[in-house]
């Protein structure tokens, strides 16, 4: 185990990524001989310029679970195109019983979002956004709903290409 911990500390990636822990849960497996305790961690990683990833890790110790979550988040990153530090347009996301509504905001508004959504926007590099979550506040479902909504977002050039029009026609 000491070898694993020294490996974790020596391989701390310095890739300019921002990391945020969302949740750490203690989980229990009941067996014939008693209870086996473990930990489940949920984390998000972003580059501050629109790339974001979510990961979850499980282990008998918290630091190992957190490390696994961070590594998975780095592997599963998606790219979201931002517009001057905010979103392109209003977007909604849903996962399970969690629903989120995300609206672009003017300069100086800040990040108006709660819980896991705030952490996502901070690591992603969004500086002005208004977000509201309804339904379940389970952190895992809220993160998945937020990422699903962000993945659905389109730039004006993508919409113009789909419709076979110019960007000027789309923007009016």
Curated annotation (Swiss-Prot):
Cysteines engaged in disulfide bonds, as pairs: none
Record key words, sorted: Ribonucleoprotein, Ribosomal protein, RNA-binding, rRNA-binding
Gene Ontology biological-process annotations: translation
Residue ranges annotated for the S5 DRBM domain, each copy included: 17-80
Record Gene3D superfamilies: 3.30.160.20, 3.30.230.10
Pfam family, one: Ribosomal_S5_C
InterPro entries tied to this protein: Ribosomal_Su5_D2-typ_SF, Ribosomal_uS5, Ribosomal_uS5_bac-type, Ribosomal_uS5_C, Ribosomal_uS5_N, Ribosomal_uS5_N_CS, Ribsml_uS5_D2-typ_fold_subgr
Record-level GO cellular component terms: small ribosomal subunit
Keyword match Cell wall biogenesis/degradation: no
GO function term, MF aspect, one: structural constituent of ribosome
UniProt cross-references to HAMAP family, sorted A to Z: Ribosomal_uS5_B
Role summary: With S4 and S12 plays an important role in translational accuracy. Located at the back of the 30S subunit body where it stabilizes the conformation of the head with respect to the body.
Domain remarks: The N-terminal domain interacts with the head of the 30S subunit; the C-terminal domain interacts with the body and contacts protein S4. The interaction surface between S4 and S5 is involved in control of translational fidelity.
Family assignment from sequence similarity: Belongs to the universal ribosomal protein uS5 family.
Subunit structure: Part of the 30S ribosomal subunit. Contacts proteins S4 and S8.
Name of the featured protein: Small ribosomal subunit protein uS5
Gene name of the record: rpsE
